[in-house]
Amino acid sequence: MAARPSTPRQRLRYTRVLESAAGCARKGLESVDLAEISEKSGVPLGTVYRYFPTANHLMLSLYRQQLDELQGRARTSAASFGGKALAGVVMEIFHMRVMQPAVEQCLRRCVYLKDKDTTELLHEIDALSETAVAIASDDAVAARVLLLTVTGLVQSVRNRRLSLFEAEEDLKKACTMLAPVAAGARAAHRSA
């Protein structure tokens, strides 16, 4: 997998490509056309391919960037909103996945394989999402359980087994059920 850009000019191009790709993420993965994204972003196609060899790489990189931004917001909201921050962070991850079918398709299709370059991206995505939720919950186990719940609920919405409203309500309930566990972990950590 290509390295992340290191110079300010490269970072600017990289960001422009990701911003252009965000619109395609709202459609399906089959609608992600790197040539079209190159044109929209004003970045040469060869440069786009250098950073993102496939549409999968592009969509996973977009999601990684979104999670990175969310993690920063989670730090400030956890301090300001306490237990309510947990539901906010988890709900935001849920909505990112539901509202971006191309990203969700990549997450479903890509698997952890030793020699696949998307594996590194998937590891980064998992770490970022777990950290963002763990910051809000102060409990790594609760974070993993909630992220697995998000995955199941996204699939249920996609398969039309649940409405978006029903899935949101279930996710709020899961956060409420796990928030006392997280609050207890915080209290135990402070008293130790």
Name each region found by the language model:
Residues 91-119, 123, 148-159:
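Amphipathic alpha-helical segments used for helix-helix packing
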Residues 1-40, 57-60:
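Basic, helix-initiating cap at the start of DNA-binding domains
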Residues 88, 109-148, 166-176:
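Amphipathic alpha-helical packing segments from all-alpha helical-bundle domains
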Residues 34, 64-71:
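Short, basic, alpha-helical segments at the C-terminal edge of helix-turn-helix-like DNA-binding modules
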Residues 61, 72-99, 123-124, 146:
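Hydrophobic alpha-helical connector segments
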Residues 58-66, 120:
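Alpha-helical DNA-contacting segments of helix-turn-helix folds
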